């Protein structure tokens, strides 16, 4: 999986940072996909500066209905239609997301020429497509807000082709059945169990993408053991009380959560517009003093999961 940050500013855009939007490129060899997490104003314009086509989007996840995470959605939906895109799109979000989208389209006399499904979610598993599952966790914010945990299922281990050939199994379709863990019967009556020729499963990757939040009970469960955790660091340590009063987190709180959850990497985003480049480096240093494996997301930054 690959993360591409389209917007990393909190509340309002700056000259160097747009408001929140994150692409997730699934990069699966047989079932690829492009997902978008939040869609602040100007997201479709940010997309133009990447190699990704809006027509490839198949799922959009909205954390909450504050404008800096949402106001780019109607324009993106309409542009997909104007471009002749017919690929279906599913939007997941909290209660009210359906009304927002339908009202914006109706009042503006707009429509979509592709199948559009809107799913209003609650806490819990959203879907499992057999390759990965997505679970929503409630966060601490003035509006109903969710973080999303994306978990790949473990992949089958490598098939020991040499051992199979030595056992008299001819390469070809039978190898595919054995790779799937099935048992086959050879012409001489022998049964070959694929599980006996498979290496240990390859653990799938796990990713946690937080919406806006102050400290909350569900945060640890959402982030526990993930390879990458994306979390806001709206304000620095000195302004922690102010951040919490508005349903946001400080650098210290983001880094402390990453350390407690045992994540592989922390990526901080949703930076207050009060911070220039020098100020952002200050935020990064504060996080790294607690959790060294921290990176600062800038617009168009790319991270592998």
From Swiss-Prot:
Q: Which GO terms describe its molecular function?
A: 3'-tRNA processing endoribonuclease activity; exonuclease activity; zinc ion binding
Taxonomic superkingdom:
Bacteria
Q: Which residues bind Zn(2+) 1?
A: 64, 66, 141, 212
Q: How is the cofactor bound?
A: Binds 2 Zn(2+) ions.
Q: Which residues form the active site?
A: 68 (proton acceptor)
Write out the residues that bind Zn(2+) 2: 68-69, 212, 270
Q: What is its EC number?
A: 3.1.-.-
Q: How does it assemble?
A: Homodimer.
What function does this protein fulfil?
A: Zinc phosphodiesterase, which has both exoribonuclease and endoribonuclease activities.
Entry protein name: Ribonuclease BN
Name the gene for this chain. Answer: rbn
